[in-house]
């Protein structure tokens, strides 16, 4: 019986790349949602910098600040919300929310704050991408960092601030990453989305 279980486990490991032992079976990340102060500015930025294209737009929806929490547990503090969905190459979509909100917190979360997040865009030409951002008035936070050892060896990354102040990242690993030499399991790669 132990031998049968071992054989079945080996077949399972050999049969597929990323497997899910339990839980919800997902095909991937559908979208990343970002709150922005100006929807048109954000659409223009993602379009000109990364080639993202607007696909859908809904709203503005009037919100009732006196209403009780909705099914998602949110009690609206904003007056209205408009939502746009962008298609970004072969990766995840980006969902943009523009809340009209005189009461909301305008401070950006810092990297160490709970709830802080960032989105990373893959490019084979990180130097060219950094030059483009700088030429277009985008604040790049330091110089690209090249990882020279460990699981992320071969990866280069740099963070930048969007026009509205969100932390974002450029990442590049055209020749792969260090972990690939020791593991058959692969992280999703936008250059090879089906692998």
Model-identified regions with their sequence ranges:
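Vicinal oxygen chelate
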Residues: 20-25, 29-37, 56-57, 81-98, 107-136, 156-161, ...
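Bacterial N-terminal signal peptides
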Residues: 6-16
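A short acidic/small-residue loop/turn micro-motif
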Residues: 62, 101, 174-176
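A short, polar/proline- and glycine-enriched secondary-structure boundary/capping micro-motif
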Residues: 105-109, 179-182
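Positively charged n-region of N-terminal signal peptides that target proteins for export
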Residues: 1-4
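Short consensus segments that form the blades of beta-propeller domains
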Residues: 23, 74-75, 108-111
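Core segments of cupin and vicinal oxygen chelate
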Residues: 35-91, 128, 135, 148-153, ...
């Amino acid at each position: 019986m132990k031998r049968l279980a071992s054989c079945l486990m080996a077949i399972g490991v050999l049969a597929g790349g990323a497997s899910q032992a339990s839980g919800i079976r997902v095909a991937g990340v559908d979208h990343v949602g970002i709150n922005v102060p100006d929807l048109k500015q954000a659409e223009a930025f993602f379009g000109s910098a990364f080639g993202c294209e607007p696909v859908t737009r809904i709203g503005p929806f009037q919100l009732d600040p006196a209403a009780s929490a909705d099914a998602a547990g949110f009690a609206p503090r904003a007056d209205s919300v408009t939502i746009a969905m962008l298609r970004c190459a072969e990766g995840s979509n980006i969902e943009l929310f523009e809340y009209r909100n005189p009461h909301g917190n305008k401070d950006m979360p810092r990297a160490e704050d709970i709830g802080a997040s960032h989105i990373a865009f893959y490019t084979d030409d990180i130097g060219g991408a950094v030059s483009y951002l700088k030429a277009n008035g985008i604040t790049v936070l330091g110089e690209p960092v090249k990882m020279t050892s460990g699981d992320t060896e071969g990866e280069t990354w740099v963070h930048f601030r969007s026009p509205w102040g969100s932390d974002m990242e450029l990442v590049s690993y055209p020749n792969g990453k260090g972990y690939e030499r020791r593991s058959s399991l692969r992280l999703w790669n936008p250059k090879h989305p089906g692998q």
